[in-house]
Amino acid sequence: MALSYESSGVRYDQLDAFKRACQQAARTTAGALAGHGYAEPASTRGESAYLIEGADHFLAHVEEGLGTKNLVADAVAALTGRTYYREVAIDTVATMVNDLITCGALPVSVAMHAAVGDSAWFSDQARTEALVAGFAEGCRQAGAVWGGGETPTLGGVVERPAIVLAGSALGRIAPKDHRITGDVREGDAIVFLASSGVQTNGLTLCRRIAAQLPQGYLTPVGHGDPRTYGEALLAPSVIYVAFVRECQRRGLRLNYLAHVTGHGWRKLMRLEEPFVYEITAPRPAPALFRFIMEAGPVELREAYATFNMGVGFAAYVAPELAPSVIAAAQATGYDAWLAGRVRREGARKAVVVPDLGLAFEGDTLQVR
C-alpha cells in the first residue's frame, strides 16, 4: 500500500484549522501596536512572516521549528558514530530566515529554542559543539546576529533522549518599497531555486520509510547518488537570504516569494487571489525523491503534495525581469531556472504541472 503524510500521523486539515483559529484571534490584538507607534499593514496575516509597520520601515517576525529531522540525525549517529547536529542547526536557522525573507525583510536577529527531556542531553560534547557551531554558521549565512535563546528541560513533555529545536527571527524592511506585497499579475514568470534535498519537511514520512527498509538509513539512494538514505536526508537546508539581498541591491522587483516547505508544491498558490500557477519546465525529481517514491512507495501526487521535490524557493516576477532574477540567483551561488508562468482562468486557483499530469486545486491548501 502506498504511504502518505497523513498515514504517518500528519494531518494538515487538523493543523490548518487550528492555524486559522489562531489567525482570527490574533487579529483582535492588533490595536495594541498603536501604543508603540506602529500599525499592522494590510494582508500580513497568513503570510510566512508577520509585519509591523513603522514610519519609514517595517519590522518582520517569524517563529519556526525544525520538526523531526534531528531524530534522523540521532538514528544515523547511532549507526555511524557521526554527529549531524551542525547540519540540523543550519536547518533550524533556515526554517526561520527563509520564511522571513518572503516579505522582503532581511534578517537582523535570530534566537534559539532548544527544549530537552533531560539536561544530560548537553553532556555529549561533540554533539553540543556541532549544534552551537551550526547555529552560528546558519546566522552567518543569513547575515544575522545570534541574539540569544532558551534551553528548557521539559521532562514528561519532551522524551528523555530527544531535543526540540526551534526559534524566532526578527527582520527589517528599509526602505519600505522593498516590501514584497504579493502584487502578482497574469503573465508573471515563476523562477525556481533548487533545494538541497528534503530540507526540513516530510521527515515524519521519511522516517517511516526508513523503518521498513532492511538496511534502514544505510540503504544506498542509487539513481546516480552515491550517498546513503540517511546522509541524503541530512543535507542541510539552503538559506536563500543572499538571493533576496542581491535582488534588492540590483533593484529587481520581486512580486511574490514562496518558501516551498509544508504542503509541497501546493505552497506555490499561497496567495489569496485566484491564479493558475502553470509549471511548464519541471526538472526531473532528484535521486533522493525518486528513492522515496520507490521505497515507500509514495505516489507521484502525494510526493508533490508533501515534499519540495527539488525546489526550495520560488520567485514570481514580471516576465521581462526573469533573466535578471535568474542571473542574480546564480551570482550568489544558487541554482535557478525559469519554471513556469502565472495565468488567469476565471475564479480558478490551482497549481498545474502538465508534463506530470498533476493539478492541485485551491481547496487542497486550506491555510495561507
Give the location of each predicted region.
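Glycine-rich phosphate/pyrophosphate-binding loop regions near the starts of catalytic domains
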Residues: G31-S196, F360
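Acidic-glycine-rich active-site phosphate/pyrophosphate-binding loop
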Residues: L59, G65-K69, T219, P282-M293
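Glycine-/charge-enriched secondary-structure boundary and capping motifs
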Residues: A2-G9, Q14, Q24, D124-A142, ...
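Basic, amphipathic N-terminal segments that precede the first structured/catalytic domain
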Residues: G9-G35, A39
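Short, acidic (Asp/Glu-rich) active-site segment that either coordinates a divalent metal cofactor
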Residues: K176-R227
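Short helix/loop capping segments that flank catalytic or ligand/cofactor-binding pockets
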Residues: K69-L71, D177-H178, T200-L203, R266-L268, ...
